Amino acid sequence: SVEEQLAQLRCEMEQQNQEYKILLDVKTRLEQEIATYRRLLEGEDAHLSSSQFSSGSQSSRDVSSSRQVRTKVVDVHDGKVVFTHEQIVRTKN
């Protein structure tokens, strides 16, 4: 009947709304994490620049830096997290 179809559509819309909210939350968290990494990288770049300027009158010295990249995968199905995986890769420049 029409009423059953309407109820089914409402249920599906509510489920999609919940999935949207979860995905929006994940997106917001990832954007915050990206902003944090950008600030860290900018701070690292500023630190390296000031180290190079201050070492101009000294004998040459090695400046080494490293970078850490964290990749996080979150698989959400029907509004539930079904799989998460995190990988950290460190590189020396």
Curated annotation (Swiss-Prot):
<keyword id="KW-1015">Disulfide bond</keyword>
<feature type="region of interest" description="Disordered">
    <location>
        <begin position="47"/>
        <end position="69"/>
    </location>
</feature>
<keyword id="KW-0539">Nucleus</keyword>
<feature type="region of interest" description="Interaction with Type I keratins and keratin filaments">
    <location>
        <begin position="47"/>
        <end position="93"/>
    </location>
</feature>
<keyword id="KW-0416">Keratin</keyword>
<comment type="subunit">
    <text>Heterotetramer of two type I and two type II keratins. Forms a disulfide-linked heterodimer (via 2B domains) with KRT5 (via 2B domains). Forms a heterodimer with KRT1; the interaction is more abundant in the absence of KRT5. Interacts with TRADD and with keratin filaments. Associates with other type I keratins. Interacts with EPPK1. Interacts with KLHL24. Interacts with PKP1 (via N-terminus) and PKP2.</text>
</comment>
<feature type="domain" description="IF rod">
    <location>
        <begin position="1"/>
        <end position="48"/>
    </location>
</feature>
<comment type="function">
    <text>The nonhelical tail domain is involved in promoting KRT5-KRT14 filaments to self-organize into large bundles and enhances the mechanical properties involved in resilience of keratin intermediate filaments in vitro.</text>
</comment>
<keyword id="KW-0597">Phosphoprotein</keyword>
<feature type="region of interest" description="Tail">
    <location>
        <begin position="45"/>
        <end position="93"/>
    </location>
</feature>
<feature type="region of interest" description="Coil 2">
    <location>
        <begin position="1"/>
        <end position="44"/>
    </location>
</feature>
<feature type="modified residue" description="Phosphoserine">
    <location>
        <position position="57"/>
    </location>
</feature>
<dbReference type="GO" id="GO:0005634">
    <property type="term" value="C:nucleus"/>
</dbReference>
<keyword id="KW-0175">Coiled coil</keyword>
<feature type="compositionally biased region" description="Low complexity">
    <location>
        <begin position="49"/>
        <end position="68"/>
    </location>
</feature>
<comment type="similarity">
    <text>Belongs to the intermediate filament family.</text>
</comment>
<dbReference type="Pfam" id="PF00038">
    <property type="entry name" value="Filament"/>
</dbReference>
<keyword id="KW-0963">Cytoplasm</keyword>
<dbReference type="GO" id="GO:0005737">
    <property type="term" value="C:cytoplasm"/>
</dbReference>
<dbReference type="InterPro" id="IPR039008">
    <property type="entry name" value="IF_rod_dom"/>
</dbReference>
<dbReference type="GO" id="GO:0005198">
    <property type="term" value="F:structural molecule activity"/>
</dbReference>
<dbReference type="GO" id="GO:0045110">
    <property type="term" value="P:intermediate filament bundle assembly"/>
</dbReference>
<protein>
    <recommendedName>
        <fullName>Keratin, type I cytoskeletal 14</fullName>
    </recommendedName>
</protein>
<dbReference type="InterPro" id="IPR018039">
    <property type="entry name" value="IF_conserved"/>
</dbReference>
<dbReference type="GO" id="GO:0005882">
    <property type="term" value="C:intermediate filament"/>
</dbReference>
<dbReference type="InterPro" id="IPR002957">
    <property type="entry name" value="Keratin_I"/>
</dbReference>
<keyword id="KW-0832">Ubl conjugation</keyword>
<keyword id="KW-0403">Intermediate filament</keyword>
